[in-house]
Amino acid sequence: MWWTPIPEDIVRDPAAFRVGRLTKAHGLKGAVKLELFTDDPDKRFVPGAEFSLQVPESSPWHGRTLTLTELRWYNSHPVGFFDGVADRTAAESLAKAILWMTPPADEAAEPDAWYDHQLVGLTVLRDGVEVGTVSLVDHFPAQDLLHVDTPSGTVLVPFVQAIVPSVDVEAGTLVVTPPLGLFEEIPDETPTAEPTPAEAAEPAPEGDDAR
C-alpha cells in the first residue's frame, strides 16, 4: 500500500482537507492527471490555488507546496498544470502525491457538507446507542467511506444519506441506519431443525446396526 505521513503543517491545521491526488503525467509539458476528492473542482482548482503535498520523505517535493496555473479537462478527465512542473519528468515525480488545502477564513459553510476533520472523532449512534467512533474518511470516485472504530474492529460505512441520515457536528454525533450485517454478524437463516418427539424417543440401534 502506498502511504505517507500527512505533512506537519496540515496536522497543525484542523481545517485542512484533501482535494485530490495526482495520478500520472499527461503529455510532455508538465501536465498531471488528477483524481478529485472534491465535488466542486471549479472552486478549489483555480489559478493561484496553493496545495500542500503528501509525499514520501524521499520525494524531491517533500516539504514543498504546489501552485496551480491552470486546470483543463481532456475527455472528461481533469488535468492540472503547476508552477515549477515544466516537463514530463517533473510531472512523473509527482505521481501519487495527495493535495491538501485550507479553505479561506471567510468561506461560508455549505449545508450538508463537512470537512474530514469535522467528521473524525464523532460518536456513531445506532438507534440511540453508541456503536463506535469515526476514525478516518476515505474518498473514492463513487462515494466516501467512513472508518468507524468499534469494540470488535473497524467497520467501513458508506457515507450516503440512506445509511448516514444525520450528522450533528456541534453535538459530536453521527447517526447510522446500516443494513443488516454491517455492524453485526448476519444470523443463520436456516437453523438446524430440532427433532420431533417421536424422533427423540426412538431408541438407538443395537448389534450389527450400531455405529
Swiss-Prot record:
GO terms for cellular component: cytoplasm; ribosome. Residues 184-211 are annotated as: Disordered. Residues 111-182 form the PRC barrel domain. InterPro entries: PRC_barrel-like_sf (IPR011033), PRC_RimM (IPR056792), RimM (IPR011961), RimM_N (IPR002676), RimM_N_sf (IPR036976), Transl_B-barrel_sf (IPR009000). It comes from the Bacteria. Gene3D superfamilies: PRC-barrel domain, RimM. It is found in: Cytoplasm. One of its GO terms (molecular function) is ribosome binding. GO terms for biological process: ribosomal small subunit biogenesis; rRNA processing. It holds the Pfam family PRC_RimM. Residues 189-204 have a biased composition (Low complexity). Keywords: Chaperone, Cytoplasm, Ribosome biogenesis, rRNA processing. Signal peptide: none annotated. Binds ribosomal protein uS19. An accessory protein needed during the final step in the assembly of 30S ribosomal subunit, possibly for assembly of the head region. Essential for efficient processing of 16S rRNA. May be needed both before and after RbfA during the maturation of 16S rRNA. It has affinity for free ribosomal 30S subunits but not for 70S ribosomes. The PRC barrel domain binds ribosomal protein uS19. Belongs to the RimM family. This is Ribosome maturation factor RimM. The gene is rimM.
